[in-house]
Each structure stands twice: as structure tokens, then as C-alpha cells.
């Protein structure tokens, strides 16, 4: 990060892991870079991930996830963080298919989301990036899904750098 540096206009670099799921590719962020995030940081990371998703000719349909659904926990720290980040993304990109804050199962289940939260901007779309409130939650999620569920995992893919970078994790196989 210090040698290559962020590309012009990027305030905070980030990373994503891509998992092959039964719904198609699922991008998780920020899985390896940023420890302490503000709502603006999360909005910036959301933009970087959306840009990466588009490089695969996929329209980003983004869920900002935490332990709360659309204000069900009004005073929780990470719920407030994700709610504020969602508002920033909505303001910057009113035409994007993005919503939050919501629990992961709500983000991944369009029927359930439509039933309980029909106002969601995600509508009946299948979410493809999930944006987490912290490095620890994103890192735990990708490791859990990759290890316990046996999903193929690509990454971390670094986002927002001047040049392409790929980092190998300890114990990476040749396939990874």
C-alpha cells in the first residue's frame, strides 16, 4: 500500500474477496485493509467495490450489512454506522441499487426482504456485493464461507491502487 499507493482521487484503498455462490459471484468488503471506518469511508469502499463488480460486466446490487434491519436497533453503533453510510451512498448515487442497513440473511433473500421491507431499493434483486461495518466482520465472513461451506474464494483483490495487486494469504494453494 505504501509503495504503490492509491490512485488519484481515492481516499481509502480497500479489498474484496469474491466467493462463488449458488447465486453467482458474491463480493465481500472490506476483508483485509481498514480497521476503523467512518460512514464516509464505508461509502467510499462501496464505490470501489461497485466499480470492481462492473469490471465483470455485472450490475452491482449492494447490501450494507450489520445485525440490524432498517433501524430495528436504533442505537447500535455498527447499525448507525451502516445506516449513515447508506444515506451517503444514496445521496451520491441515487440511481444505484443499494440499501442497508440490514442483516446478511435479509440481504441475500430477496423474497424475505420484499415481504418485510418492500420499500427497500434492492427490490427483488439478488445482492452481489456485501459491505460490512468492520474488517473483522468481513474477514470472518469470507473465512467462514470459504472454509466451512467449501466455497471457492478469490482474493483479496485490492481496490483503489495505482496498479493491480494481488496478495496471497498464508497457506494459499496453487489454485488460490
Regions found by a protein language model. Give the residues of each.
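Anion-binding alpha/beta catalytic cores of soluble intermediary-metabolism enzymes, centered on
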Residues: 1-80, 84-124, 128-176
Amino acid at each position: 500500500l505504501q509503495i504503490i499507493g492509491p490512485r488519484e482521487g481515492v481516499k481509502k484503498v480497500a479489498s474484496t474477496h469474491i466467493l462463488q455462490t449458488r447465486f453467482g459471484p458474491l463480493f465481500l468488503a472490506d476483508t483485509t485493509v481498514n480497521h476503523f471506518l467512518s460512514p464516509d469511508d464505508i461509502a467510499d469502499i462501496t464505490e470501489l467495490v461497485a466499480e470492481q463488480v462492473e469490471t465483470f460486466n455485472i450490475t452491482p446490487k449492494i447490501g450494507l450489512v450489520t445485525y440490524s434491519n432498517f433501524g430495528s436497533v436504533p442505537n447500535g453503533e455498527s447499525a448507525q454506522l451502516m445506516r449513515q453510510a447508506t444515506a451517503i451512498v444514496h445521496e451520491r448515487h441515487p440511481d444505484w441499487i443499494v440499501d442497508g442497513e440490514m442483516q446478511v440473511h435479509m440481504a441475500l433473500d430477496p423474497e424475505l426482504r420484499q415481504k418485510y421491507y418492500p420499500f427497500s431499493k434492492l427490490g427483488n434483486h439478488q445482492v452481489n456485493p456485501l459491505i460490512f461495518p468492520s474488517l473483522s466482520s468481513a474477514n470472518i465472513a469470507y473465512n467462514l464461507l470459504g472454509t466451512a461451506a467449501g466455497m471457492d474464494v478469490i482474493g483479496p483483490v485490492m481496490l483503489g491502487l495505482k496498479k493491480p495487486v494481488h496478495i496471497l494469504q498464508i497457506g494459499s494453494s496453487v489454485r488460490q
